[in-house]
Amino acid sequence: MTKQKIAVLGPGSWGTALAQVLNDNGHEVRLWGNVVEQIEEINTSHTNQRYFKDITLDSKIKAYTNLEEAINNVDSILFVVPTKVTRLVAKQVANLLKHKVVIMHASKGLEPGTHERLSTILEEEISEQYRSDIVVVSGPSHAEEAIVRDITLITAASKDIGAAKYVQKLFSNHYFRLYTNTDVVGVETAGALKNIIAVGAGALHGLGYGDNAKAAIITRGLAEITRLGVQLGADPLTFSGLSGVGDLIVTGTSVHSRNWRAGDALGRGEKLEDIEKNMGMVIEGISTTKVAYEIAQNLNVYMPITEAIYKSIYEGANIKDSILDMMSNEFRSENEWH
């Protein structure tokens, strides 16, 4: 692939790691963010200490606070901003774009209020005149491992297989590999909802439960993610792939996962506001729990784990009681998909 110019919007942990992957592949990478001190640090010290204490970035990676400069004459734009500001940033990009680009996103969440997936937001806010079909970059990936060039396999999903293949070539190298998929609904739904299950898995650990319980919540969590995804139009096979069970395993079993750590703290009795303050990073699983619960209620989809987490976070229920209540639910077949 010839050298591409790529704007990465969002210099958080994942945005920074993906910027490094793209830089390793010989592309011109421009990181954009709105925290002046952070951008200056990346440009002068070539570090991003808030997220990576011992990592030095390549000096060729340039960071910007001016969005217009960051996206000027680029071939593609990668959104890696929190769900809650995706629409705002997309509006800003739409007002500045002067040529057609490939639009990608690597965030995982659902918009509160509208319940929309992030690709839908980008489609709504950026005119088709200035963009490709949206490409979703998602899968089992800790930024802490990708940044040290550990082997990582994820998915590039788009309704346009040509766009997905472009992104596959853009990122893939000897340690980072992408597989294509056309099931955007499934890939995005899996990526968003696994954060809820990760909160639950962390809570089980914080409460002192063992591996049996953790395996149970991951597998039954996958079942309810699939139930909702299929109801929304996803291909059930997607949930057995990298962006489904793969992402659920890595997020639901690792201390690298901020959602798992948040759940662990909840299980140990910490208050949510203290957890969010101490972590200093966005915990997408918290807001996604509310959105997923509302969607499930509207569509009458059985999601007991999501409901238990919702009641604990938003209704003040005791997390242990909420989990134990599931043990007295009506008996069901393992293969019920409704």
Swiss-Prot record:
Its main location: cytoplasm. GO terms for cellular component: cytosol. GO terms for biological process: carbohydrate metabolic process; glycerol-3-phosphate biosynthetic process; glycerol-3-phosphate catabolic process; glycerophospholipid metabolic process; phospholipid biosynthetic process. Sn-glycerol 3-phosphate binds at K108, G139, S141, K194, D247, S257, R258, N259. Its EC number is 1.1.1.94. One of its GO terms (molecular function) is glycerol-3-phosphate dehydrogenase [NAD(P)+] activity. Disulfide bonds: none annotated. It is found in: Cytoplasm. Catalyzes the reduction of the glycolytic intermediate dihydroxyacetone phosphate (DHAP) to sn-glycerol 3-phosphate (G3P), the key precursor for phospholipid synthesis. This is Glycerol-3-phosphate dehydrogenase [NAD(P)+]. It comes from Streptococcus agalactiae serotype III (strain NEM316). The lineage of its organism: Bacteria, Bacillati, Bacillota, Bacilli, Lactobacillales.
